[in-house]
Swiss-Prot record:
One of its GO terms (cellular component) is mitochondrion. It comes from the Eukaryota. It is found in: Mitochondrion. Transmembrane segments: none annotated. It comes from Arabidopsis thaliana. This is Uncharacterized mitochondrial protein AtMg01410. The keyword Isomerase does not apply. Signal peptide: none annotated. Keywords: Mitochondrion. Its main location: mitochondrion.
Amino acid sequence: MFGGRRRRLPQDGTFNQTQPFDRLVGSRHSFSFDLKSATDRWPLVFLFEVVQYLFDRSFASSVVNSAFACNIFEVPFVKLKRRFSQVCFVAGQPLGYHGSWPTFALSHHILVWWCAKQVHPGVRFTSYAVLGDDVVIADQEVAKVYESALGGLGVKISYQKSLIPIQVLLSLLNASGLGNLVLKREIFPRESGVLSLMSVPSLA
């Protein structure tokens, strides 16, 4: 069901991995974000809101709460009033559940749309490409909102594997106070102005 919806999105690379990225060739700025363990940290409450928005609350409860968060475990080493503590998933994708990845991938699109709406209200945003947990956004302001939104969801960005225009990258470094970092030019031509951020320990 969700796979069919994504097939109709020209910005989705599930069924053609290069096509959505080819559309962005020639963009002035492109921000490629690599997410850290996105499928493990993607909050179920966000998935619930996405499915509820697309369908209804009852369907969202069945898909997300009953399927994704149905695994309840007893923790024997933590006791609460003479009984074992019970825990369940509040983030991530359960192994073996067929619908978890398509739901996550579609929610990734919706997150980008929401970010774009904050910057360009009333405008259909198409200057991006999504392939599962990988995303390229060809708009500086939308990319900033996306980065902030991920922080709100508790999902981290691997800046060592992300590609960000040098001017924006330097401003991010100055704002965050990250001093233990170096820049290494990748295979991109010098005039592209694109650098890869790598940590010092990773170069050792």
